């Protein structure tokens, strides 16, 4: 099984419902952590790891949408390969001084889609 965890400034029950529906897995464990900047994201993610009832934890933001329908089973298949311990969808090969990993698009890796006003 997979746990999905995210940090948010305010509770978003509609996002929890979206995650469950889009995953295609009704029993998806979702851990929402309301955090108004009092804790670092790393600390919140560590709390999620401690609370998770599964060995696989997906961290995400509270404003994402999955382009892949029924993504749960597809993601789970990747973890059946024992040579994976961590899987990422997007990032950079080098972190600029600004901390904005998307600043140099030539160093971006993965898939990032943004809505026009998002």
Residue ranges and their predicted role:
Residues 1-24, 31:
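N-proximal low-complexity "stem/linker" segments adjacent to membrane-targeting elements
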Residues 27-39:
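A short beta-strand-loop structural module common to alpha/beta enzyme folds
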Residues 57:
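Short aromatic/hydrophobic "clamp" motif used to bind/position activated sugar donors
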Residues 36-52:
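Glycine-rich, basic loop-to-helix element that forms the pyrophosphate-binding segment
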Residues 60-62:
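Active-site acidic Asp-centered loop
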